[in-house]
Swiss-Prot record:
Gene Ontology cellular-component annotations: nucleus
Pfam family for this entry, one: Fungal_trans_2
Deletion phenotype: Reduces markedly the expression of hepA and abolishes the production of heptelidic acid.
Keyword Lyase in record: no
Record's function text: Transcription factor; part of the gene cluster that mediates the biosynthesis of heptelidic acid (HA), a sesquiterpene lactone that acts as an inhibitor of glyceraldehyde-3-phosphatedehydrogenase (GAPDH) and a growth inhibitor of the salt-tolerant lactic acid bacteria in soy sauce brewing. Both hepR and hepS regulate the transcription of the heptelidic acid cluster, but they are not involved in mutual transcriptional regulation and act with different mechanisms.
Domain of life: Eukaryota
Recorded GO MF terms: DNA-binding transcription factor activity; transcription cis-regulatory region binding
Protein keywords: Nucleus, Transcription, Transcription regulation
Protein family per UniProt: Belongs to the TRI10 transcription regulator family.
Any single biological process term in GO: positive regulation of transcription by RNA polymerase II
InterPro entries hit by this protein: Fun_TF
Name under which the protein is recorded: Transcription factor hepS
UniProt subcellular location: Nucleus
Amino acid sequence: MISMSVPRKKQEREISLLMHYVDDVFPHQFPIYHSQFVGKREWLLPLLSSTRSVYYATLCLSLLHKEKSSNLDQPGSVSFCQEERLRYYILALRETQQLLQQLSPVCDLEAMRSCVPSLASALHLISYESSCPVYGDWKVHLQAATSLIPILVGGWNSMIKPIKHTSTLWTGLTLSDFHDLHTEGSLSYEDASALRFLTNALAVTGILSFISTGPTSALSDYRYLMDATCDMVQCDQFLGCENWVMSAILDVGLLDRWKREEEGNRRLSFRELANRAKRLEDCLENGIRELSAKTSGSSDAVSSITRIYASSTLTYLHSVVSGLNPDLSEIQESVSRTIELLKELSNWHLLACLTWPLCVTGCMAAPDHEAFFHSLAISAEISPHSLRHTWIVLRILKDVGKVRGSLGEQILPTWEQILCIDGAPILLT
């Protein structure tokens, strides 16, 4: 726990901001994460007050949420809030950089203990930088978080016993599954719970970011994370989308990277491209059929979200293979399927978890579907005052419509060119 000597009034205000994060910001950021999962939120407050880096990053994010959600109609109030937010941000940035610089590359207990607040701070700064009106360089913080993947994977697999049971780690892990948790020579239960959650947050953020940044070399890091963590990553309990679809999104990104590299070397084989794409398409189609058969007539949130992500991933796949051409029959088919699934949603608030598929589908949809996406925004009460990025989809769709009009019959540019506002890439989380 951090120890700081600050005036009482300031201390009270900072504690109030911490509780605002716990009560309002955290549920808003992660609406699918429920208290029945292992660890509940018992790890959250200890984490937020564990180091100066996490503490300050939480305060600046909490202030940003207050600023966006409150009616600060007095210029003085707005100015004070912004100044405080910027001050905490600078402190968080400095402390996080120091923490990362001190982190040992050796995967031992001390590195794991330091890795938890380092990752938490980086993820907070990503949320802060990627939100309106900040729109800063969230990519540098994601790069820092991605560099922690080897420590996360190595530490998790070495410090948690191999567990064989029918349920997932998040729903089946108990204290007896840890090595000597009562001693100082082991990872605490709170740290282990935070580690699970933060690793899932990193996996989801990283995988969904590549459509905005382009298929970088970091794709391989996330493939390693998904394959090597022995069920630690459970995206359905974090985002509502099952792992197999998140892996498919990752594989489409890897296909995009391979295609661009082959094109750059003037050796792209269209037959090989078609074969690779067909394997991904078959995997997605089979997964959708199996899920639909298991959940026929069900309004379960995870199955609904997973099918929407899977269907929109097909659109993403077709756009990578054939270009961003909304007139292609295969793109029209997957777009229509996704729109039908969106219409079947029984809970409009689930749209908060669907920024990525909404954007992919909306950008490739026919112009006559524009009214449908606006009606979704109204139904879900999507607002620019939110820390989530669902509302920005509407602006992107409007910009894409303008680009289409100017290009005529030409296809749209790359995804990373589309998903950019005022020179900053938009994170679709």
